[in-house]
Amino acid sequence: MNKGFDTLLEYSFIHIPGIKEKTEKKIWEMGILTWDDMQENILNPEIPVYNRDLVKSYIIGSKRALENVNIGFFRENFPKKEYWRIYPKFKERTLFLDVETNGLAKELNEITVIGTLYKGKFRSFINGINLHDVIPLIEDCLIIVTYNGNLFDIPYIERTFNIWKKNYISLDLRWIFKRLGYSGGLKSIEKQLGINRPDYLKDVNGYTAVLLWEKYQSRRLNALNVLRRYCLEDVKNLVFLLHIAYNRLCKELRFPQKIKPLSEKFKWEIKINCDFSIIDEIQMEVKN
């Protein structure tokens, strides 16, 4: 009956009206695991659904949306807390993103650097140089992954570029990890999971990023490269965290069949020439 799939999306029924978590699990326990299974067995009176025509139409719509890369269908119909299921199927159009700002009061606070990973390529976008070049990536992507981005990164991007992109899915890892029982900022979550940053970046935080931008503004050009490197470390670790979260949430579902786990190991190298001694300089200034 079941052909088997690498990702959880095609096993999901939770986006169909009338099917909640308990009902979805009952359906799985009956051996109805995929959209195809449901189509083939829709007349089975033991399947705990009430409107079979509605279920059938949603199965057909789901297949069509997947074939046509229509992320809007899944965005509108999946519960937000289940958006994580969608990621692997649209991985190639997923934008990992981190925003740094100048740290001023709200009306004066503006983006300084945006770091991204998209289609396997790390990039930096810098205020006063190429900041607006990030727009094509935002317009092309189908999923945006951030940490606390729903409250911070995305509002700043919308305000800065006057982009009100609606047809995408936002995966904010802060709330995904809260569901898994973790709390704290990005660096705190990394430490709790045993993700280690390079020694030269271990003591760098958001406040250091603000001071690096100030150094750059005072013509310390190396400070910009250090800031870019720090920002892209945030971006890189978003991928680790999302894959860890996906694998753990899959296990929590207790799905009857093993879902292929996402890789939690990467060998990325972020190539930016930096003199990290400026970090020690900043830390000494802060202490004094």
Label each residue range with its predicted role:
Residues M1-E110, T116-N288:
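DEDD superfamily 3′-5′ metal-dependent exonuclease/proofreading module
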